[in-house]
């Protein structure tokens, strides 16, 4: 662990103390430090600040800087991402139900470029009038009439279908008069259809090739690997679009929309890096903390993050203990706050080491009381940590007795 990584761990833990007197000076101290986005992303600082230091100006400034940085990167990726999404959808001869619903839902996020791309896709899908009505596509296209060619094309297509339906209704009477002739012709068609079915059964390889599906026998291993690679890339890009949709729905603040988006996108199955990239945890704090599904997703993200940095937390703890207590004769209040954090979220090793320090060092009663260490001791149920915790309780009680006798 290098110095930058160590200091970012220290900053993250300091923000969790909720202590403005510790948070502000440390952020000021680190203001000129050059830190990579990967390290900042790892600690999810916007979400940390939203939860633990929402009113601290220095922390708010840090969060804002990180969000601006990330949004700039997302903006640079957006054009390529939308172009590829359009390609993926248009490559399908028949749109998948999921992609159809995703595309039709994205137009409601009020993002001009995103809506333009989705209208372009929708035109290629060749939807029915019922679909245009069910997904509210025509109504949305009317909002952009004259502003984008894709919206005008949808309006034109719908008008043409409506006109065609009028002609069909006028011809309905004539069609009814020819029912007997139609029934006779259908008998002949059934025989022809059966022959076509038999032909398709015998020429299944041709039908598969025409639909864009190739068997392993038709492809050599390199071609097959390339197809699989492209498929994986396409799936990854669709996942990015899903995160755009989920983020937009959370920003709406509407509980029903948030729950529906979490369920529709399968948000719990996406990798941590993608959830962090689109600041899903941060957005939940800002717009969706009132929603049970969003809260479950937020806790899920926290769990994934704890697993990811578990090894680094161990390394940070060892470095912190070594640098803090190498020649220390006393324990400062800020160190007490950090140590209490190890009691709250540390593993057995961290907790035991922390309790050893509390037993060994000359810590005052007021320091124990102000840091609320005793509350953490109640959660120690068994093992070495529980034994050390009992000993620390005895130490605190002894300090209380001495303090009482003095007064």
Swiss-Prot record:
One cellular component (GO) term of this entry: cytoplasm
Keyword presence, Nucleus: yes
Expression sites (tissue/organ): In the embryo, expressed in newly arisen somatic blastomeres.
Cellular localization per UniProt: Nucleus; Cytoplasm
Keyword tags: Cytoplasm, Nucleus
Nucleus listed as a keyword: yes
Family of the protein in this entry: Belongs to the Pes-10 family.
UniProt name for this protein: Patterned expression site protein 10
């Amino acid at each position: 662990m290098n110095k930058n990584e160590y200091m970012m761990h220290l900053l993250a833990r300091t923000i969790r103390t909720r202590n403005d007197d510790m948070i502000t000076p440390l952020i000021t101290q680190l203001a000129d430090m050059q830190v990579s986005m990967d390290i900042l992303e790892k600690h999810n600082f916007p979400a940390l600040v939203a939860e633990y230091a929402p009113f601290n100006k220095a922390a708010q400034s840090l969060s804002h800087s990180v969000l601006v940085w990330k949004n700039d990167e997302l903006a640079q990726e957006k054009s390529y991402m939308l172009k590829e999404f359009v390609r993926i959808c248009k490559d399908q001869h028949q749109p998948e139900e999921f992609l159809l619903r995703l595309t039709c839902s994205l137009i409601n996020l009020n993002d001009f470029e995103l809506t333009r791309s989705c209208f372009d896709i929708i035109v290629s899908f060749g939807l029915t009038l019922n679909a245009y009505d069910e997904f509210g596509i025509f109504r949305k296209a009317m909002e952009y009439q004259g502003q984008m060619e894709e919206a005008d094309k949808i309006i034109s297509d719908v008008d043409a279908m409506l006109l065609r339906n009028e002609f069909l209704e006028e011809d309905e009477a004539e069609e009814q008069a020819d029912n007997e002739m139609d029934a006779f012709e259908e008998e002949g068609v059934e025989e022809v259809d059966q022959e076509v079915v038999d032909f398709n059964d015998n020429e299944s390889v041709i039908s598969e090739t025409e639909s864009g599906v190739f068997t392993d026998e038709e492809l050599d291993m390199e071609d097959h690997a390339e197809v699989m690679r492209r498929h994986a890339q396409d799936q990854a890009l669709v996942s990015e679009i899903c995160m755009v949709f989920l983020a937009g729905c959370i920003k709406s603040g509407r509980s029903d929309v948030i729950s529906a988006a979490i369920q529709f996108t399968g948000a719990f199955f996406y990798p941590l890096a993608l959830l962090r990239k689109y600041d899903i945890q941060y957005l939940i704090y800002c717009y969706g903390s009132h929603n049970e599904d969003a809260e479950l997703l937020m806790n899920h993200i926290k769990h994934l993050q704890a697993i990811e940095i578990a090894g680094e937390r161990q390394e940070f703890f060892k470095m912190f203990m070594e640098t803090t207590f190498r020649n220390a004769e006393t324990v400062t209040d800020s160190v007490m706050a950090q140590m209490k954090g190890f009691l709250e979220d540390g593993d057995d090793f961290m907790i035991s080491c922390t309790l050893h320090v509390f037993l060994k060092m000359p810590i005052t009663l007021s320091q124990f009381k102000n840091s609320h260490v005793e509350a953490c001791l109640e959660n120690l149920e068994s093992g070495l940590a529980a034994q050390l915790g009992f000993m620390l309780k005895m130490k605190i009680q002894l300090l209380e007795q001495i303090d009482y006798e003095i007064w």
